From Swiss-Prot:
Keywords: Coiled coil, Nucleus, Ribonucleoprotein, Ribosome biogenesis, rRNA processing. One of its GO terms (cellular component) is 90S preribosome. Signal peptide: none annotated. Residues 103-120 have a biased composition (Low complexity). Belongs to the RRP36 family. It comes from Chaetomium globosum (strain ATCC 6205 / CBS 148.51 / DSM 1962 / NBRC 6347 / NRRL 1970). Residues 1-203, 307-338 are annotated as: Disordered. It comes from the Eukaryota. This is rRNA biogenesis protein RRP36. Residues 221-280 form a coiled coil. Associates with 90S and pre-40S pre-ribosomal particles. Residues 121-131, 163-183, 321-338 have a biased composition (Basic and acidic residues). The keyword Signal does not apply.
Length: 338
């Protein structure tokens, strides 16, 4: 009885794992190894030849199939050996390399260094775009601990200056109220709301400032007396006229302040009377602006003589007539004067 060997398909022969045999490393150059080693086309051809041999073995005897199997096994072993030689190649000697290979290596190193430089530049630009604000890494740095809990905290003075200038925006520093001289700005911080017609904060501030700086009236009176004395002594006409204008300005400011004080006194007196009436159960009565002016005029004329009252009325009549003439057109102004 003849022993029949089992045939294996050629595809399984190519995929079968074969243990590589140990061979000493060749002492030739890399170029010789590449030239001696079979290319991928050769491997493909050998595989195709193995397939053709497998087809022929079906018609031929069993001895032919054994030879094909041995050829396929040897080709797979050679392929594995070549892969190992490619992975674990011998160390390259720089003296044996050509100038072209060295130039390519230098170009590759330059390109890698330029890429790293570009990455660092991009990181710097991102930091600059942050307008100098500290990042998470910089804020994470902790300062040294204090030697004592009562010791002052040490802060670094090397803080980056922001590129953003917010002088046009409203910040906390611009909103912070600044100290002002009440002689020149008596209305205080609520002047804007009072000018718009809503809010009595400005009047309250003005009353407080007036009471707190009432002693300035004595200083102004003494200054006016000194000005009158210097006007009498000066002989230069230009200097004398300049001093007279200054004295007239101070007198007009004093008259305006006295008028405001009288108006405020009239309103305060009316409020006191109304508070007493409200306590008795009556409804409060609020004065209109026109009624306030009438009461102020009555109070002003009460302390004057008849001649002074006539002068004040004549002055007021001329003032009102001048305002009315300004409102008329030029043609009618001439007719009115005639």
């Amino acid at each position: 009885m003849s022993s029949v060997k089992r045939k294996m398909p050629p595809s399984s022969l190519l995929q079968r794992r074969v243990k590589p045999r140990y061979e000493p490393e060749p002492e030739s150059d890399i170029e010789e190894d590449v030239s001696e080693g079979p290319s991928e086309d050769d491997v493909g051809l050998s595989g195709s030849e193995g397939e053709e041999g497998g087809e022929l073995s079906e018609d031929e005897s069993g001895s032919g199939s054994d030879e094909d199997n041995s050829d396929a096994a040897s080709s797979s072993e050679e392929e594995d050996d070549e892969e190992e030689q490619e992975d674990d190649g011998p160390p390259i000697d720089a003296s044996q390399l050509s100038f072209g290979a060295l130039a390519k290596a230098q170009a590759a190193m330059r390109s890698s260094s330029s890429k790293s430089q570009k990455a660092s530049d991009a990181a710097k630009t991102k930091e600059d775009e942050g307008y100098g604000h500290p990042t998470k890494l910089s804020s994470a740095k902790k300062l040294d601990k204090r030697s004592n809990k009562h010791a002052p905290v040490e802060l670094t003075s090397k803080k980056p200056v922001s590129r953003k200038r917010d002088f046009l925006t409203s910040t906390a520093e611009t909103k912070r109220p600044q100290a002002r001289d009440p002689r020149f700005t008596p209305l205080g911080p609520g002047a804007s709301t009072a000018a718009a017609g809503g809010g009595s904060g400005s009047t309250i501030d003005e009353i407080k400032a007036r009471k707190a700086y009432a002693f300035l009236d004595d200083y102004r009176a003494s200054e006016m007396q000194e000005l009158r004395a210097t006007i009498k002594k000066t002989k230069d006409a230009a200097q004398r006229e300049k001093l007279q204008r200054a004295l007239l300005s101070m007198e007009s400011r004093k008259k305006a302040q006295d008028r405001k004080d009288r108006e405020r006194a009239v309103i305060e007196e009316h409020r006191k009377k109304e508070k007493e009436l409200v306590k008795q159960g009556k409804t409060p009565f609020y004065l209109k602006k026109s009624e306030q002016k009438k009461r102020v005029l009555v109070d002003q004329f009460q302390g004057m003589k008849k001649r002074q009252v006539d002068k004040a009325i004549e002055r007021r009549r001329k003032k009102v007539a001048g305002k009315e003439k300004k409102m008329l057109p030029m043609t009618r102004r001439g007719a009115e004067e005639r």
